[in-house]
């Protein structure tokens, strides 16, 4: 059941189970809508082949609803349930909800904040896709969310794709893997936090392949990457991502303010795009002669970078081979 208040532009949903997502439908065939005079009429589903009143009501909800309140008892927000609600700025999700379906809130471009209750176990692909003003996604403490994508190695599967205003993202502790496209289009990210069980990109984790393709975590505003202290796979050193043994540099944030970075002693290798697109970076000091660099795109589009290296070092050979500016240090 649902009803809509035209004065407050609020859609209230009650019942048990899920919401109906057939075509543009969001609830069930017994849905009702308040008229201005307080009476109700049955509009069936949101399908465009319904009555004239039904079509008008569907259009009104999609274009004018500003607030959605889902009452306790609803367990699933079905696929595309509220997609393209043009005026939606706020949605309240109760602790009874366990699943948010694919594209559930896609293209809700006025939505700015959302809180995911701890009860949610799965968030489908594209759930918040193209919510271009969504700057805050908060997972309640003790989140049970363990799945956030349906097709982990395909573009378009991320629930937050093209959330261009998203500033921070804290991965729920139960998430182990994401696809390499997960942060695609999240151009305003300043901080990312990974939970205690997070390992890396699905299908690429292993020996030294974790985060070897960071194609989507390329926000030029990203200043720091955080990792839960109890995570056995990853480590954050001053906001820079390493493996737990601190021997492999995985990702240097693109928006880091400092123009100089000294690679810690003990670092044995770097991922294939660890410094890619770090155009603020001017100086990288590598004093370890034995450190081996293999990937040409490691410093791709680092337009101002100079490597400070030891003579007769592996890194010196790499700089020469890849035509990267370098200076010899004692």
Where are these predicted regions, by residue range?
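Extracellular, modular beta-sheet/disulfide-rich ectodomains of secreted and cell-surface proteins
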Residues: 1-9, 15-29
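Structural signature of tandem-repeat unit edges
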Residues: 8-17, 63-76, 86-99, 109-122, ...
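Surface-exposed intrinsically disordered loops and tails
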Residues: 27-57
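Extracellular leucine-rich repeat
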Residues: 46-48, 81, 100, 123
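Leucine-rich repeat
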Residues: 50-60, 158-160, 214-216
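Acidic, glycine/polar-enriched metal-coordinating patches/loops
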Residues: 299, 322
């Amino acid at each position: 059941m649902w009803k809509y208040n035209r004065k407050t532009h609020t859609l209230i949903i009650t019942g048990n189970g899920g919401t109906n997502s057939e075509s543009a439908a969001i609830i069930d065939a017994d849905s009702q809508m308040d008229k201005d005079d307080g009476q109700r009429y049955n509009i069936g589903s949101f399908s465009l082949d319904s009555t004239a009143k039904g079509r008008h009501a569907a259009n009104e909800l999609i274009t004018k609803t500003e607030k959605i309140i889902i009452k306790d008892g609803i367990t699933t927000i079905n696929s595309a349930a509220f997609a393209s609600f043009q005026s939606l700025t706020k949605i309240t999700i109760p602790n009874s909800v366990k699943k948010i379906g694919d594209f559930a809130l896609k293209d809700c471009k006025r939505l700015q904040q959302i809180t995911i209750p701890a009860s949610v176990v799965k968030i489908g692909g594209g759930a918040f896709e193209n919510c271009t003003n969504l700057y805050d996604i908060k997972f309640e403490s003790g989140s049970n969310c363990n799945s956030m994508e349906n097709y982990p190695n395909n573009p378009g599967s991320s629930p937050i794709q093209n959330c261009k205003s998203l500033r921070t993202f804290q991965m729920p502790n139960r998430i182990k893997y994401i696809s390499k496209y997960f942060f695609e289009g999240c151009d305003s990210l300043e901080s990312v936090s990974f939970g205690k069980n997070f390992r890396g990109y699905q299908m690429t984790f292993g020996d030294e392949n974790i985060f070897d393709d960071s194609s989507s975590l390329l926000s030029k505003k990203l200043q720091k990457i955080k990792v839960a202290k109890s995570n056995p796979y990853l480590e954050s050193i001053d906001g820079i991502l390493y493996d737990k043994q601190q021997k492999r540099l995985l990702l240097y944030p693109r928006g880091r303010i400092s123009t100089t970075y000294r690679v810690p002693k003990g670092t044995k290798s770097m991922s294939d795009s660890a410094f890619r697109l770090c155009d603020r970076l001017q100086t990288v000091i590598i004093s370890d002669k034995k450190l081996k660099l293999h990937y040409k795109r490691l410093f791709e589009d680092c337009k101002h970078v100079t490597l400070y290296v030891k003579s007769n070092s592996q890194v010196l050979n790499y700089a020469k081979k890849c035509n990267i500016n370098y200076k010899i240090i004692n």
